[in-house]
Amino acid sequence: MGLEPYEGRYTLQLQDWTERAYKKRGIEYKVVPGTTIDDTKAISVGQVLDAHGRSYFGMSQMMNLVQMMRNGEVTKDDVVFFEDMFQPGMESLPYILHQVEEKHRPTIYLRCLAQAIDPDDFVHVWGMSKWMSMYEQMCNEIPNVKILATNEEMVAHMRIANWSAPIYNISGLSFGKEEVQGRVPDRKPFIERKQRVIFGARWDQEKQPNFFMALALKYKEKHPDVEFAICQGGPLRSNNQFYVDEAKYLAKQGTLTIHENLKKNEYYELLADSRVMFNCALQDWVSNTVSEADAMGCNTLFPAYRSFPETFANDHTRMYVPWSMEDAMDKLEVLLSKPSPSIGKISDWTDGTIDRMIDIMTGKGEQWRRDGQHYRNTVSESKY
């Protein structure tokens, strides 16, 4: 049960990455189709996914899954994997599964990407947190359901919310390193790259764009030749218009460069000619931007916050104290001057995320289970 593709999001490649891993492992699978609301592959309403498009695609997909279940094509020996826990029409699953014989009840795996358990998620910004938390509780009541969390810290949020279903940490987001690198085979050596710092997250308040703008202003006082670039897959927009107005003002002043409406390959080409990907998000779980930048040979500088110590395997040289401008600037100066000896390791690890999910779904990943008494014992351990 995949996600609809968006040009400005990693969902554009998600199904391809997943199918490559399934084929490599010899997994018998079927992609349940959905119908897109239009052919734009654009987010018109909302932030993370298009509000109408996600609903339309998800419900059409659920209709097809229900048809397969009614036809007897889905049994207790099967797994139904949802790329995203939020799936319009999901309530039909517990409604059906509570009424059919056990032989017609597959195991359900839901991958959670954020939602109401994250206090900085967009559902809180838009006042949707109450009904979303109730939706999450419903998902926990689906027969034979299991939850896939993207990292240890997200597991903690699920436990705080008293989720009752079995929880597994997949320690990463889905990623296909070979496919991504294949889009830009000729990547410049680090020393030949532009002195450019990229902000690749959404320009929304939970990503703290004000911190990035303040960093650019302060850093350029001593290093005026360094470029600070905002890269967006669509037009520059935000859930707080102030950030858009301020970014455009700073662009006119020469402090920022704004790259809008980028196609994937255009974005990757910019990464392959840049030195640092910078992140200052309050709300980010692993982040696809770190995998993409790392795969393109770009240094990554992220806050030592929430999931990032796990993602970076506790690498103190590429994480700064949140929210210390001084520490961020000191580490940025180093990472602009030379490549980290650990470039490539993050994307190698996240390249295995789909395999970890396959292991869990085929009964070979119990070491990743996190709903027991000692689920916090593994938090400080480097995963690679």
Give names to the regions the model predicted.
Residues 281-283:
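Aromatic "clamp/platform" in nucleotide-sugar-dependent glycosyltransferases that forms part
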Residues 1-93:
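N-terminal pre-catalytic "stem/leader" segment of glycosyltransferase-like enzymes
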Residues 227-244, 260:
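Glycosyltransferase donor-sugar binding loop
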Residues 60, 323-326, 334-384:
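A charged, aromatic-enriched C-terminal amphipathic alpha-helix characteristic of glycosyltransferases
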